[in-house]
Regions:
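Core beta-strand elements of the Rossmann-like FAD/NAD(P) dinucleotide-binding domain
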Residues: 26, 155-164
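Conserved N-terminal/central alpha/beta ligand/cofactor-binding core
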Residues: 43, 49-50, 55-139, 143, ...
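Bacterial Sec-dependent signal peptides at the C-terminal "C-region" and cleavage site
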Residues: 13-25
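N-terminal Rossmann-fold NAD(P) dinucleotide-binding loop
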Residues: 37
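Conserved beta-strand-loop-beta-strand element in the redox core of flavoprotein oxidoreductases
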Residues: 141-159
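Beta1/beta-strand and adjacent pyrophosphate-binding region of the FAD-binding site
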Residues: 24-34
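Flavin (primarily FAD) binding-site architecture
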Residues: 167-179
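Single conserved hydrophobic/aromatic residue that forms the stacking wall/gate
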Residues: 180, 184-189
């Protein structure tokens, strides 16, 4: 069979449609890798859900671990959960719980990079959890039983599907993208 220019272009177009048409499927997609988004991702993965965190930067923990706000109102009597794992890792890093009490503002203070590295270690331990750093959701559409997202990653728009979508961004980025499925204020019509 001889390929002419037009037939060759048609073949390439068909192959391109097949290559671009398949979406990556997750049970849960969390847009935003701040403290709440990372904690939600860890918990979903631990419950057996195939989970993706889409994070705009290469840093986890958001305002908890960056911008010089690494002083929490953490209570040492609050034992359990992801907060306790995080606090225990901080104490391990600095040598003991009392090493975290270094200021007037908080009972738990730490260097931002230490918080980021702890979250990254916790995430890396979870086989059901994937993090896409330097990525952003650009489109979001609610189907009958699935969310369809277009996520910009490595300069390419990737298609992702999930049964559950969590907007854990600082400013409600997904809510702004998907105005049909989301009410943007508390007023009622």
């Amino acid at each position: 069979m001889r390929f002419t220019g037009l037939k060759y272009l048609q073949l390439l177009a068909c192959l391109g449609l097949f290559a671009c048409g398949s979406a990556e499927r997750y049970d849960v997609v969390i847009v935003g890798g701040g403290a709440s988004g990372t904690a939600a991702g860890l918990q979903a993965a631990r419950m057996g859900a195939r989970t993706l965190i889409v994070e705009e930067f290469d840093w986890l923990g958001g305002m908890l671990t960056s911008a010089g706000v690494s002083a929490t109102d953490g209570n040492y009597r609050l034992r359990g959960g992801i907060w306790d794992e995080f606090r225990t890792e901080l104490a391990r890093h600095y040598g003991c719980d009392s090493a975290l009490i270094t200021g007037w503002v908080s009972n738990v203070m730490f260097e931002p990079s230490v918080g980021d590295s702890i979250f990254k270690r916790l995430v890396a331990r979870e086989p059901n959890l994937t993090v896409w750093y330097r990525s952003a959701a650009e489109t979001a559409e609610r189907g009958k039983d699935v969310w369809r997202l277009g996520v910009r990653r490595d300069g390419r728009l990737r298609q992702v599907e999930a049964g559950v979508l969590v907007d854990a961004t600082e400013l409600g980025d997904v809510a702004r993208i998907d105005r049909k499925s989301t009410r943007l204020n508390s007023s009622h019509p």
